[in-house]
């Protein structure tokens, strides 16, 4: 797949550099590479809803002032179908055909890692709101993110289950074919065994994307004597695993990760997920200030509480707009303007996001805190504690 993507990129590269590289001076165009269909369409919906709400708010107030000129925002949404190859194709279209100044997304690491390669190759700023895999930004000066990384999230989960449940033995179940759960599972295992010693992860079970029967792996986990099950899977897969585990006799805690944090989780899982915990980026219940304003506005407009993807998309888009403002003026030359935006993104410090304060490292990753959420007996995501670097 990598060879075909790079071949496609080279073909487009020839086309791009044979045409004028300028953009409309009347609107600021931003591309969104998001999953509107496929395995995780709720992620795409949340992303688009948050972006549209922000765009309407800014355009309604007159637009974005950059230097001595004011621009309206134009957002272009491309469906990456929750697939890596579609994400790269979407990035190429946004960059070369739509000639956006920057790209927001993809969200999931499986799509963000390859799309990041394309954006960096074309020197186009990209901000992934939700991708926690280090490979997304590694050695890619044009690629940023609005969330913490898995090398931080893995130890957060390992320390939490140790302190909260007194866990001395852990089991892990994850999709070996997907970048996000595979990476996070490995970081959790390393952190847990650093605390409790080699072999304390007594079951390290895998499956592959689209599997629906986990009975063999879960039987091994139940028999392993583990005190905790770590399940770093997406919200659409979690209910299947949880219900099958409970049917096989699992009565101990299950710890999740930020990929649990979708409103869709409780529709699919219901009471089976009550009482479980997961690490994430923000908690809607009990929010205050600008975060509460965002939640109330989103809930009023769309009829449900925004998940972490919506909140992170809001923050990622605002980060981009701040960087654009900080250029102090756009030239109309898309290469120069993309470079200027990239440079300003790297300089952002103490950005007050609704998911927390952020300062970018030289790698394009924000230094920020994680939140531990408990799923209440009402099915709500309740703030439990905050964990900072």
Where are these regions (language model features)?
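C-terminal segment of classical bacterial N-terminal signal peptides
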Residues: 15-23
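Extracytosolic ligand-binding ectodomains
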Residues: 2-4, 8-11, 23-389
